[in-house]
Amino acid sequence: MKIALLTDAWLPQVNGVVTTLLELVRELEGVGHEVQVVHPGLFTTRPCPGYAGIDLAVRPGRLVAKMLDDMQPDAIHLATEGPLGWAGRRHCLRRGLAFTTAFHTKFPEILHAALRVPLSWGYALFRHFHRPSSGVMVPTQGVLQMLAQRGFGNLRLWTHGVDTQAAIAN
């Protein structure tokens, strides 16, 4: 299967989302899938205001559309709700393509703490982003319950597990 993975979180960032996605790609490729990652390094970027070390793609829409059209993937996963996720979402909706999404980070809380954006606004925006998804992947039962209480639908539990080889080595 050919899978397009769109993410605003990728190397050289070091965080839990990047670690999760790197392992996902490794595991998928290990069982024979072809994964093409669409990440900020393929675009003109600007630093994310107030979030050191995070670069965001600037106006990625046309290039994302071209990349997805050229790839002709069997599956599309939008891993993040940043510019690449929104561009992928827009393209999929225009073309009538199914896609999945993931909720990795309580970003509405970050927006609230950093910019005083009301939590209700942040979660409304994220509900809008995830609503057309074929499935919203969430990391824990607790996150699933929290999002369900906030009106999110189509939630799917996607536990990340532990890399036992890395745990043993350390």
Model region roles, listed by residue range:
Residues 64-85, 95-100:
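Short N-terminal targeting/anchoring amphipathic segment
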